[in-house]
Amino acid sequence: MKFYLAPMEGITGYIYRNAYHQIFLPMDKYFSPFLAPNQSRSLKTRELQDILPENNPGIPLVPQILTNQWEDFVWATEKLRELGYREVNLNLGCPSGTVTAKGRGAGFLANPEGLDRFLDNIFSRSTAEISIKTRLGIKDPAEFERLMEIYSQYPLKELIIHPRVREDYYKNLPNLAAFARGAVSSSCPVCYNGNIFTQKDFWEIETRFPQISAVMLGRGILKNPMLLEEIAGENRREGSAGRTSEEKCRLRRFHDKIYTGYQRIMSGERNTLFKMKELWTYLGSAFEGGERYKKKIKKAERLKDYENAVGALFEECTLIGKN
């Protein structure tokens, strides 16, 4: 079984990836937050910085592309090839309204025939290995049957299935029955993505779907960066589900690497604080209690106040036990 880090817009950029890769059990692949090539055949400076090889040393990175124009996709794959990337991922899963309103991400799933033409064009013109990250459809999981018919016509590197429809966003439980039908009918390797927050969650997916080749971890890793180690059994102590002081120290080092990384590239305290507060919306779940410190982190307007709140949280609060 292989493990991938999901692309989480605004969070899992190269600062986060480097810190995670250096401190915790490495992923087999890391997927970048989406790149959105525009009609002028260019990428934003921020997007380009995120995928530059020198900013991702030793990291097996797969750039993700968001577009519904085959010409832009092919251009982007050639640009990425110049940077050394052989595999790219097509985003057909983003549920954001600003994305889907333009018929991109999960919004592209509303136009199966247009998607079919798009795939025909990119597979006939691009030299890249192409994987797809998809949802089940827009409103009804039954839409996935037609989508699978389309996907099966093309030589996908891999199909990453998030078994929710666009209208679910991240609510409701993943539709495992629909995922099962997709996994059985797929002509390429299948990766599961969705609601793996604990070791038990992973075991249930692995047991039910022994044919899948990989699992993609997203919010579960953001909430508990040691999740992959727990799944692999690399940080469990016999007879105890408690956390060790070494684990807490590693989590602090992880935080500090991200913090100093953002200070280095962001302009001004406000922007650094915004990025760190976004991280804490997930990372705060790793701690027992400490609500008053978490509130201080959220309300901090100066880096000094932020540092004091984080220091107190790590000093006085324990990590939630393994489950």
Predicted features and spans:
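Flavin-dependent oxidoreductase catalytic cores
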Residues: 1-323
